[in-house]
Each structure stands twice: as C-alpha cells, then as structure tokens.
From Swiss-Prot:
UniProt function note: Involved in mRNA degradation. Catalyzes the phosphorolysis of single-stranded polyribonucleotides processively in the 3'- to 5'-direction.
GO biological process terms, semicolon-separated: mRNA catabolic process; RNA processing
Main enzyme class: transferase
Domain KH as annotated: residue spans: 560-619
Name of the protein in its database record: Polyribonucleotide nucleotidyltransferase
Localization of this protein: Cytoplasm
Residue stretches making up the S1 motif domain: 629-697
Source organism (scientific name): Synechococcus sp. (strain JA-2-3B'a(2-13))
Alphabetized GO MF terms: 3'-5'-RNA exonuclease activity; magnesium ion binding; polyribonucleotide nucleotidyltransferase activity; RNA binding
Main location: cytoplasm
InterPro entries per the UniProt record, alphabetical: ExoRNase_PH_dom1, ExoRNase_PH_dom2, ExoRNase_PH_dom2_sf, KH_dom, KH_dom_type_1, KH_dom_type_1_sf, NA-bd_OB-fold, PNPase
HAMAP family: PNPase
Family from the record: Belongs to the polyribonucleotide nucleotidyltransferase family.
Length: 712
C-alpha cells in the first residue's frame, strides 16, 4: 500500500494518521500520533484452521518501556509478561471490535497495538481503538465498522473529552464509550458514587463526540478507496434445520417452561440432543443428512443451540417469562454470611442463585503495596482485588493455571467498583488485598465478587464510606422489540445480546462495564438498563445489610497493628543507617516492621502487642534533638584517663569528665564506672562542634528513678 497521511482535529487535539509507512507485511499498519503519544496498530488475517467453529480473534496491546525513555528492570533488562494494565487495554480494544465481525468468519485475525512513545498526560487506549478500526478495514477483513471510542471525565460538574491523568484523578468520572453507526457498543467506567442521570449524560456526551471520529474514518477509507468487504454467510442445510425444528422444538419449549435449575435444564437438553443424534444414526448409511453430519459433526449441536436461542428469546419477548420463571426485573434469591474463615482478617460468602463467591480480605502494611512497572504515571496500588475462577465452579475438570485475561479483567472491575468507597490513606494506612474465589458460577460472578468483597471488607473492620453492590443486566432485542433483564444467569448471557454490569452505592454508580453481542444500542436503551439496574442493586444491598449493617468497630486480632508518625525528612538517613543497618537493628530488636516514606512518614507494624510501640520509641530516640539539661539513661562504652564515654541515645554519645562522675574527688575513672555499666546522666553542655558533655551531678533521686523506669 502506498503511504497515506492525514491529520484530523478532534476537540482541540491533532491526530496524525499514517498508513503504509510501517509494517509492510502486515495486513495493514496504521501509525497514529497525538501530542507525544505514538502508536502502531496492525491487523493481519490468515486462513482459518480446519475444524474451528468460532471466530479466532486475538488482540494484543504491547507496552514498550522505551516509549517513556525507560529501561526495564530485572536481570534480562527487557519486557516480560505483559503487566496487568496492558492486559486490560487489550480487552478494551477487543470488546468494541469483536461484535462487528461476521459471526461466521473463521479466519485467524490478530490486532496488535504497540506503544512507540507516550506522554505522561493522556491515556493511549482510546487511540488504539481508532487505530484498530482503520487497520482492520485497511487489511480488507470483513468488518461492520468503523468504530471509535472516547474518554469522558467530569471535573467541577463539567464533562471533559479525553481528560488528562491529572483531570481523571481530580474528577468524579473516568468513562470510555465506544460506538459505531448503529449505536453504543461498549462502555467502561469508574465513578465516585455518581448519580445515574449524570452517567447517562456522560455516555450521550461521548457518543456524540464519537460521530466526528466515525466521519473522519469514513473520509480516510474513501481516500484509500477502501469499501466494506462482504462475507456472505455459509449456505444453510435446510434439511438439518427442518429436522431439528420438527424433532426438538416442542421438547425445548417444554424444558424452558418447566423453570428448572441450571443442572437439571442442561441435563434434559443434553438428553434431547442425544435423541436427535440417535435418530440420525438410525438412518440408512447413504442418507444425505447422515452423510452431511459425518462431514460436519458440530453442525447438529450448532443448529440445536440456534433453536434453543430462538425459543428462549421468543419466550422472553412474547411472554415476559425467563427460563427460571422470574420476571424480567427480578433478582434471584440472595443470601450472605460473614466471618466464616478463622485467622483471616475478613471473610464473606455471597450467594445469588447458583452463583457463589467467597471473598477474603487481608490487611497489610504500606510496604505491601503493589509496585507497578508500566507506562502509567501511578507507580503503586494500595488496594488489590484478585479474582479466581476454578474449573469446579462450573462442574469441569481442568488444570489450574496463572490468571488469564478474563480473571484479570473481572478482578479489575471489582477493584474499580470498591476503590471510591475506601478510606483515605491518612485515615486508614493499611494496604488491602481482597481475593474473590468463585465457588459456583451461573452468571455475573464479577458482580458477586463486588458484593462479597464489600461484606468481607466490613467484616475486616475496614471503614468503607458506603457499602457497594452490583448486578449484571441483559438484553433481548429483535427489531424494535427490546427486553431488559435484571440479574442475568449463564444461559441468558450466552444467548442474549448484552452483558451490562453496574456497581454502586445508594448514592450512585462506582463502576460500569457494558459489552454487546450485536452492533450497538441507543443511549435510551442504555439509560433504561441503568435505571432498572438501580432497583436490582438496592434489592441486593438490602439483603447484604441484613447480614452486617456496618464495618466492625475493631480489626481482627490477627491483623497487623500500625503506628504512624512523622519525622523530619532530614532524619531518614539516621533511621536507615549505613546500608540499612540501623533500621534492621530496630526490626531485629523489636520484631516490628518499619516502613519509611520520603516525606518522613514512618509506619511501624507488628502482630504482637508492644512491638510497634517499642520500635517507635527507638526511632524517636534516634531522631530526638539533644538539649542541655535533659536527663537520660545511658551505657558506658569506653573509658579514658580523663573520663568515660556514654551512649545515651542510639548513635549519640557524650563524655563524662572525671570531675563530673561524683560529688567527691575521683582518683581513677575505673573506680567509679566500668564498660557496659548503666548510668543516669544529664546533658551539661554542647560545644560548637556538636560534642556533648555529660554529668552525673545535679540529678535528683526522683528524676533518676523516673528515667530508669521509663527505659525498662
């Protein structure tokens, strides 16, 4: 492709587009630059592999630390496993483009976004979505685009388009909305308990701005003479369709109307499908349908699922009844328990229908904060939420592996939902980690994690500002007919058109995540879903608060105890000591852990009472300013003919002249004191060189006793 360049102005920012200069062997390489951020996005297509019955799309966001002028740490000094943020951006690019490919496309498609340079002001993720849309079209891959995305912030009650990191931090909203010609296709948001109406206005504001990016893309495609690539659907086997409908339609309808639980429903559906397979096998060997299924063994299952999807959706659209008998806006039964697990700092078991999540809270010290090594300006996290989804939660056997993209994404969503209600570091200096173990899954385990984690944090005594609950909303849409479902279960997610997760407090929303399986919905439908979700969230929240109404007033006995105080930043070196010798000595002597911040904030933690207080006393003694007239208990460190040296504070030593050892005349220093003797001394004077002169004279018996008692 010949090199093509174009610059577009978008709400005060210039976006430079270059197609054809880079990655000549990729299907298409799009180089985008905005400010000092530069991204290369490629799209490549290969013929599909035999037997694949799904669309194998792979989206990767590659962070390179050279983009910020940094060299990676570690022995190899090169990037390793993608950081969590890169995984989340990969998902953010994937989610708005996936629904726009024809569902029958079986070719391998890969989209790779590589950061070449980034500034430290604006996130690069929405630029990647623009590049992905252009690259897919440029690679002549069948795609119902273009698609674009924008970020919306809210600062001082005003919406801001593509806000800076500083504006996001200062504001009450961080929302990414993606859309195409047919409507909104993806929403991702974190908010500071924002009212529903404000969130809807933000989505509408962003969707209107997206139209400019869609028009700009259309102009680029017209300049390059790129027209949409049509991929007609594969021919249908009408005989198979008729056979499945004739033999299974009434059976499926009957199963759906029995309002069975998940296990019983799946068992009956499998038995019905097995009967169809048996009927096929009973046909003569030369029967055309039998021969077709021998060549296409997955087609019977595919057609059976298609009929199940059609009938389930009809039942919802025409009768307003769901597969488990619930109304469209009804939440499954909810039950909760807290404090189940001994020794942990907080625990909760949350049940909603057949979805069950166990959330465990652990409190740590400031040194336990997660250090981040990526291109984001934030370099550590005080709150971590980890989500695990084992095979047994859906009745499957599979090996346990490191967290995949889904686990990372669900954990990040639950984390985003809870961060706005966590106490400030000054009020609660603990680092908090919550792990959500999915023990049983039948829809919306991420929102189950939000609910379970709220309960677990309250059980741990974390003073959250308000409890958070979450619910997943679904959609069934046929033409103009729309039905929104509250608290979707697995089959409604799988056969429906939308998965819209909403989390928040009574005051407002803290997190949103909307994904579509169709090519977009109107803002009005989004608003309806958000409003219906509020009723569902509040129903769940009421059930949660019946279990525990407020955070426990005290932390668990097993939680570390923290003492936080300030010292002069100039004294940090004294506390650390050469090579860390002094602070290690404090830790070894007391058993407490010491964390030191650059601003002079000291956090001392211990699991045993008294250890933290002892460490604090040692640190305060280290940095205490010595003044004339102060009395200390010290230890004799060495003796010289004219006096004795005494260490009266860690690292601080003074000399008692022989004339100051006693009221009477002392002939030899050794006659009065010996090395290692404890002596009560008073600061007599400090000379211009900082040398400290001590005395044993002029100290009352009461004062000496007080100092000895305080020390011991």
């Amino acid at each position: 492709m010949a090199e093509y360049t174009r610059s577009i102005s978008f709400y005060g920012r210039e976006i430079d587009i270059n197609i054809g200069l880079m990655a000549p062997q990729a299907g298409c390489g799009v180089w985008l630059t905005s400010g000092e951020t530069s991204i290369l996005v490629t799209a490549t297509r290969q013929p599909g592999r035999p037997g694949v019955d799904f669309m194998p799309l792979l989206v990767d966001y590659e962070e390179r630390l050279y983009a910020a002028g940094r060299i990676p740490g570690g022995y190899l000094r090169r990037e390793g496993r993608p950081p969590e943020r890169a995984t989340l951006i990969s998902r953010l690019i994937d989610r708005p483009i996936r629904p726009l490919f024809p569902e029958w496309l079986r070719d391998d498609v890969q989209v790779v976004a590589t950061t070449l340079s980034v500034d430290d002001t604006v996130p690069p993720d929405v630029l990647c979505i623009l590049g992905a849309s252009l690259a897919i079209h440029g690679a002549r891959i069948p795609f119902n685009g273009p698609v674009a995305a924008v970020r919306v912030g809210l600062v001082k009650d005003e919406f801001i388009l593509n806000p800076t990191y500083a504006e996001i931090e200062a504001g009450d909203l961080d929302l990414v909305v993606a859309g195409c010609a047919d409507g909104v296709i993806m929403v991702e948001a974190g908010a500071n308990q924002l009212p529903e109406k404000d969130v809807v206005e933000a989505i509408e504001f962003g969707f209107e701005a997206i139209q400019e990016l869609l028009k700009a893309q259309q102009q680029v495609l017209a300049d390059l003479n790129i027209t949409p690539v049509e991929l007609p659907p594969p021919p249908k086997n009408e005989e198979l369709i008729a056979f499945v409908e004739e033999q299974a339609q009434e059976g499926i309808r009957s199963i759906l109307r029995q309002f069975l639980d998940k296990t019983s429903r799946e068992q009956q559906l499998e038995e019905l499908k097995a009967k169809l397979e048996a009927q096929i096998q009973e046909r003569p060997e030369g029967d055309p349908l039998r021969l077709y299924l021998l060549e296409n063994p997955k087609e019977l299952d595919n057609q059976f699922k298609a009929l199940l999807k059609k009938l389930m959706r009809q039942q919802i659209l025409q009768e307003g009844v769901r597969v488990d008998g619930r109304k469209l806006d009804e939440v499954r039964p909810v039950s909760c328990r807290v404090g189940l697990i001994p020794r942990v700092h907080g625990s909760a078991l949350f049940n909603r229908g057949l979805t069950q999540v166990l959330s465990i809270t652990t409190l740590g010290t400031p040194g336990d904060a997660q250090e981040l090594d990526d291109l984001h300006p934030v370099d550590e996290k005080r709150y971590m939420h980890h989500y695990n989804f084992p095979g047994f939660s859906v009745g499957e056997t599979r090996p346990s592996r490191s967290p995949g993209r889904r686990e990372i994404g669900h954990g990040a969503l639950a984390e985003r939902a809870l961060v706005p209600v966590l106490p400030k570091e000054e009020e609660f200096p603990y680092v908090v980690r919550v792990v959500s173990e999915v023990l049983s899954s039948n829809g919306s385990t991420s929102m189950g994690s939000v609910c379970g984690s709220t309960l677990s944090l309250m059980d741990a005594g974390v003073p959250i500002k308000a409890p958070v609950s979450g619910v997943a909303m679904g959609l069934i849409k046929e033409g103009d007919e729309v039905r929104i479902l509250t608290d979707i279960q697995g089959i409604e997610d799988f056969l429906g058109d939308m998965d819209f997760k909403v989390a928040g407090t009574r005051a407002g929303i803290t997190a949103l995540q909307m994904d579509m399986k169709i090519t977009g919905i109107t803002v009005d439908v989004v608003e309806q879903a958000i409003r219906q979700a509020k009723a569902g969230r509040e129903f769940i929240l009421d059930k949660m608060l019946e279990t525990i109404a407020a955070p426990r007033p005290q932390l668990a006995k097993t939680a570390p105890r923290l003492l936080t105080f300030k010292v002069d930043p100039e004294d940090i070196g004294k506390i650390i000591g050469p090579g860390g010798k002094t602070v290690r000595g404090i830790t070894e002597a007391t058993g407490a852990k010491v964390d030191i911040s650059d601003d002079g904030t000291i956090t001392v933690s211990s699991s045993v009472g008294g250890q933290a207080e002892a460490a604090r006393a040692m640190i305060e003694n280290l940095v205490r300013r010595v003044e004339e007239g102060q009395v200390y208990l010290g230890k004799v460190t060495r003796i010289i003919p004219i006096g004795a040296f005494v260490e009266f504070l860690p690292g601080k030593e003074g000399m008692i002249h022989i004339s100051q050892l006693a009221e009477y005349r002392v002939g030899r220093v050794e006659d009065e004191v010996a090395v290692e003797d404890e002596v009560v001394v008073k600061v007599r004077s400090i000379d211009h060189k900082g040398r400290i002169n001590l005395t044993r004279l002029g100290i009352s018996p009461e004062e000496a006793a007080r100092v000895r008692n305080h020390h011991h």
